């Protein structure tokens, strides 16, 4: 029988934003239609999820929690102030757009991905954890799929055209695909996946993979073949649900693409790097990102400029 965990949320507060100057002209090495552009991304992003714990009684903290490894970020589709943050030690929630955070649930699981394709369904996948919520993250159930060589899932995404199609990058193994909503998986590609830390599926059928060794890769045939789009380590990817031509990538900072990932430009340089990144479904101009300097960032203009929340 599936294990379920109850969780509570807190009331929101107003958010203040400190302006952050964008990087002057620090480009990233990119590939756009065969032409190289510069990008220097080098951050290890891992996304996390948590299992079997309750956050009741935990106090709120101002700013990002002081905890190792920020991994994953998810924005509530109907309320852009409600956020989930996956870390190495559990799941945190914010009700005020990232100004305050509270430990919530799932302590002890190193899940490295959060995905909410549509409605109330939320997926959590990572190191020795694979879970699903049907109520927006209030309760969770374990998923034990057939066909995966292990539950060390470093990259995970859901096809926006069909929520039954899932992709999982299994560390040291390859890219696996499910066509039945996660009940079973089969190998889609042994060319990528072993070192992938971020996956994104686009409505036009393409798959993007951020690889530790090969950079940002793109497949237009379900993973059968790949081409390099970024000559750099890309550890975080986010596709704007309202405008899938607008994408964000994180690493040594934040980069923006407005042509579906074919070309990129640096919009914020962060010496300590950035990890989790996410768009708000209810506001296509709003995006959030987590800096490894324990700073939470917000963009209100479609990812072009960023400010520190606090």
Describe the residue ranges of each PLM region:
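Extracellular glycan-interacting surfaces
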Residues: 2-310
């Amino acid at each position: 029988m599936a294990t379920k965990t109850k969780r509570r949320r807190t009331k929101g507060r107003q958010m203040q934003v400190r302006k952050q100057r964008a990087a002057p002209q620090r480009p990233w090495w990119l590939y756009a239609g065969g032409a190289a552009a510069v990008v220097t991304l080098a951050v290890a992003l891992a996304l996390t999820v948590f299992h079997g714990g309750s956050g009741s009684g935990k106090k709120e903290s101002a700013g990002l929690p002081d905890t190792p490894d920020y991994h994953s970020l998810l924005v509530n589709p109907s309320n852009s102030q409600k956020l989930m943050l996956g870390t190495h030690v559990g799941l945190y929630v914010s009700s005020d757009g990232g100004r305050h955070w509270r430990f919530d649930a799932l302590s002890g699981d190193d899940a490295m991905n959060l995905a909410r394709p549509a409605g109330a369904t939320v997926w959590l996948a990572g190191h020795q954890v694979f879970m699903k919520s049907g109520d927006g993250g209030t309760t969770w159930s374990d998923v034990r799929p057939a066909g995966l060589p292990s539950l060390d899932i470093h990259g995970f995404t859901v096809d926006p055209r069909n929520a039954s199609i899932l992709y999982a990058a299994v560390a040291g193994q390859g890219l696996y695909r499910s066509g039945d909503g996660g009940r079973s998986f089969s190998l889609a590609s042994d060319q990528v996946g072993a070192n992938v830390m971020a996956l994104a599926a686009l409505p036009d059928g393409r798959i993007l993979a951020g690889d530790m060794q090969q950079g940002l890769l793109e497949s237009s045939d379900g993973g059968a073949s790949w081409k390099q789009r970024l000559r750099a380590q890309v550890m975080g990817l986010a596709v704007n649900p309202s405008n899938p031509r607008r994408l964000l990538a994180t690493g040594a900072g934040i980069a923006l693409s407005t042509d579906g990932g074919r070309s990129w430009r640096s919009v914020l340089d962060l010496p300590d790097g950035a990890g989790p990144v996410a768009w708000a479904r209810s506001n296509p101009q709003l995006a959030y990102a987590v800096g490894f300097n324990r700073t939470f960032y917000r963009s209100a203009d479609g990812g072009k400029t960023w400010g520190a929340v606090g």
